[in-house]
């Protein structure tokens, strides 16, 4: 199944100025943020289904879908970047993470395809070769990572078009929830949280990476968005491989991605696994999608396996920032300590 447009029922109204060329009032025009440095690009999201207990089969299924995505769907437009979902090589269960975990020997100062291909990681080897074969950026969803200190992380490796492992994001915020009558899930029983923000430097501009539950924390996206924002070098998008469940998905999936997009005036990209139709394992929400800086979901799948194509358009970012110039209207003199925790007085 290939998709290019959002579902009709999810098309959202958009402010009239967004589609027209405005002559902004002098006071607003003088405050306009500098144009974002970047160029438009095409992205493909693989909403992967059929993940089971056989890791080799899971990897082969992902590889086949990457090869399919490269063909560009019905339009035949090859994507510049391909994204896989969260935990695509393993069942999504705390009891499985250590069993399926792999070492990821990543040194950003020595990024190379050989570093990935020669590692003992079956998943890294496949992803590196797939990126090289596709000649496209590849955000490798996420996989369980076994660190040298024996800790387990939920980690997202990113590969450049020549197959080099260029970034590794470890999920910062762990998914520990207990919703009465809904779902109880505690990643912290197995996983350790990461401790850094991950930003890619690409020919399209800066792109930040988060994983699933990271989306619920506006501070992470805000921190990523502020990097170079004042001189037009801020992030153009933030990508989240994610696996919301069928309790939180219908409540918050669309809401949170639209909020992060509007807050930071960049694109939000969400790539989910397809929803499992049998068994008693984890049921992902699905609905992989792309939201623009005005909060419009411009492309979205439903719950089944599929490949979604969308364009990340620099003109859309610049028009949003010119029309509602919050990037230059923030009052850091009032809330300079917005991310600090204060003790009760």
Tell where the protein language model's regions lie, with residue ranges:
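N-terminal mitochondrial targeting presequence
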Residues: 1-31
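N-terminal active-site segment of His-dependent metallophosphoesterases
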Residues: 30-81, 239
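Short, glycine-anchored, charge-dense loop/turn motifs used at functional sites
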Residues: 43, 158-166, 289-299
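Cys-nucleophile CN-hydrolase/nitrilase-fold catalytic domain and related Cys-dependent amidase chemistry
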Residues: 55, 67-162, 166-168, 176-177, ...
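Active-site catalytic loop in hydrolytic enzyme cores
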Residues: 105-109, 145-236, 245-259, 323-326
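CN hydrolase (nitrilase-like) catalytic-core segments centered on the catalytic cysteine
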Residues: 116-139, 206, 212-308
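Short beta-strand scaffold segments in enzyme catalytic cores
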Residues: 140-141, 155-158, 198-200, 288-290, ...
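A conserved C-terminal secondary-structure "cap"
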Residues: 317-345
């Amino acid at each position: 199944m290939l998709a290019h447009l959002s579902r009709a029922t999810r098309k959202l109204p958009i402010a009239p100025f967004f589609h027209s060329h405005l002559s902004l009032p002098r006071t607003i025009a003088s405050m306009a943020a500098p144009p974002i440095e970047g160029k438009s690009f095409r992205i493909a999201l693989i909403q992967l289904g059929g993940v089971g207990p056989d890791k080799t089969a899971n990897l082969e299924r992902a590889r086949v879908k990457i090869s399919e995505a490269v063909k560009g769907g019905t339009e035949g437009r090859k994507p510049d970047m391909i994204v896989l979902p969260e935990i695509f090589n393993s069942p999504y269960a705390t009891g499985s993470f250590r069993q399926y975990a792999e070492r990821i020997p990543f040194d950003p100062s020595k990024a190379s395809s050989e570093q990935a291909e020669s590692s003992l990681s079956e998943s890294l080897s496949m992803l590196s070769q797939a990126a090289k074969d596709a000649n496209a950026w590849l955000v490798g969803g996420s996989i369980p990572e076994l660190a040298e200190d024996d800790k387990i992380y939920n980690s997202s490796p990113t590969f450049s078009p020549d197959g080099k492992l260029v970034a590794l994001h470890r999920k910062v915020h762990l998914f520990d929830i207990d919703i009465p009558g809904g779902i109880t899930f505690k990643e912290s029983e197995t996983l350790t949280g990461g401790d850094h923000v991950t930003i890619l430097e690409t020919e399209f501009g800066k792109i930040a990476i988060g994983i699933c539950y990271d989306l619920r924390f506006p501070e992470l996206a805000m921190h990523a968005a502020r990097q170079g924002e004042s001189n037009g070098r801020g992030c153009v998008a933030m990508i989240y491989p994610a696996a919301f469940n069928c309790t939180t998905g219908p409540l918050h999936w669309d809401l949170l991605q639209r909020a992060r997009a509007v807050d930071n005036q960049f694109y939000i990209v969400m790539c989910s696994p397809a929803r499992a139709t049998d068994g008693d394992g984890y049921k992902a929400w699905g609905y992989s999608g792309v939201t623009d800086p005005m909060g419009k979901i411009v492309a979205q799948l439903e719950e089944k396996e599929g490949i979604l194509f969308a364009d990340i358009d620099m003109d859309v970012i610049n028009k949003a920032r010119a029309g509602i110039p919050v990037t230059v209207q923030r009052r850091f003199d009032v809330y300079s300590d917005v991310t600090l925790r204060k003790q009760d007085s």
